[in-house]
Swiss-Prot record:
Disulfide bonds: none annotated. This is Chorismate synthase. It catalyses: 5-O-(1-carboxyvinyl)-3-phosphoshikimate = chorismate + phosphate. GO terms for molecular function: chorismate synthase activity; FMN binding. InterPro entries: Chorismate_synth, Chorismate_synth_AroC_sf, Chorismate_synthase_CS. The lineage of its organism: Bacteria, Pseudomonadati, Pseudomonadota, Gammaproteobacteria, Pseudomonadales. GO terms for cellular component: cytosol.
Length: 363
């Protein structure tokens, strides 16, 4: 099965299934000398892990990461970093009754046609459980970038019909929704409580921002920074759309409104999301992700079995009514992985480039 590795110089390979014994990752290309321990990775894993509120799946996983290689005496050695997270709360019996059925809007049908065999327990490899390893790997990238003054962080900007205005980064970590507006939290909680009573699910929008990114990252033409970000962010389970900067709002904008004018004091706007011509401009990198509603709901739906016969499906098990609630750390991880990979590529080709034009400050 190909397609399990991302990156050119900083690479992340993941393996493991939702109900397998463990999840693993190999992180290759991390520069040597970075101080690193499991604690550095655990913070983001704790932000993503299930069972932390009544609004997420009640599967209880500690998601405690083990560093198996690539770190000696508290520092990275430049060799591959092996990571492992053990699965401890699988309930595979929840899926035995549907092993020959295709859950609507899941990967069951497509995996079956592609491989001729599939792990039906919790979606197997297609489960969002896999993203735990992305978060662990992304935490390594985030720490390295932080040493260069680059900060990657995200928040929920919409849940279903509820738009969430940005008010403060301080508020994001103070609630289960990663909401930047504390006044919206009661409304979000009430909406999710009603959603559970309706036995339904809903989508969400996540915004992720990288600040302190220097100009010059991105490899035109096919490895443009925005193209790489779209690739990485679209690879996250349930993501159905990615915007950079103003994104689809650009359609209704005029050129006089959309263009980010330059002054000696800095850019006057950031509709481009910090990327011009596929290369970082030095402004904040801004991306938005649209996540679809969870397909695993207890409301009956029509489907077929492996023989092609019609069936009525009710998906059992423990599932997130809104996968977007836990998606913020995943989006941060993927952006950090992309940025570190691009930074190392820029360093490898253009480390000797010197430009007299000053770098504009971020307004």
């Amino acid at each position: 099965m190909s397609g399990n590795t991302y990156g050119k110089l900083f690479t992340v390979t993941t393996a493991g299934e939702s109900h397998g014994p463990a999840l693993v990752a190999i992180v290759d290309g991390c520069p040597p000398g970075l101080e690193l321990s499991a604690r550095d990775l655990q913070r983001d894993l704790d932000r993503r892990k299930p069972g932390t509120s009544r609004h997420t799946t009640q599967r209880q996983e500690a998601d405690e990461v083990e560093i198996l290689s690539g770190v000696f005496e508290g520092k990275t050695t430049g060799t591959p970093i092996g990571l492992l997270i053990r699965n401890t709360d699988q309930k595979s019996k929840d899926y035995s009754a549907i092993k020959d059925l295709f859950r609507p809007a899941h990967a069951d049908y497509t995996y079956h046609h592609k491989y001729g065999v599939r792990d039906y327990r919790g979606g197997g490899r297609s489960s969002a459980r896999e993203t735990a390893m992305r978060v662990a790997a992304g935490a390594i990238a985030k720490k390295y970038l932080a040493g260069l003054g680059i900060q990657v962080r995200g928040y929920m900007s919409q849940l279903g019909p509820i738009e969430i205005p940005f008010r403060s980064w301080d508020s994001v970590e103070q609630n289960a929704f990663f909401s930047p507006d504390p006044d919206k939290v009661p409304e979000l909680e009430a909406y999710m409580d009603q959603l559970r009573r309706d036995q339904d699910s809903v989508g969400a929008k996540i915004t992720v921002v990288a600040e302190g990114v220097p100009p010059g990252l991105g490899e035109p033409i096919f490895d443009r920074l925005d193209a790489e970000l779209a690739h990485a962010l679209m690879s996250i389970n349930a993501v159905k759309g990615v915007e950079i900067g103003a994104g689809f709002a650009s359609i209704a904008q005029r050129g006089t409104e959309h263009r980010d004018e330059l002054t000696p004091q800095g850019f006057l706007s950031n509709n481009a999301g910090g990327i011009l011509g596929g290369i970082s401009s030095g402004q904040p990198i801004v991306a938005h992700l649209a996540l679809k509603p969870t397909s695993s709901i207890t409301t009956p739906g029509r489907s077929i079995d492996t023989a092609g016969e019609p069936v009525d499906m009710i998906t059992k098990g423990r599932h997130d009514p809104c996968v977007g609630i836990r998606a913020t750390p995943i989006a941060e991880a993927m952006m950090a992985i992309v940025l570190l990979d691009q930074l190392l590529r820029q360093r490898g080709q253009n480390a000797d480039v010197r430009v007299d034009t000053p770098v504009l400050p971020q307004l």
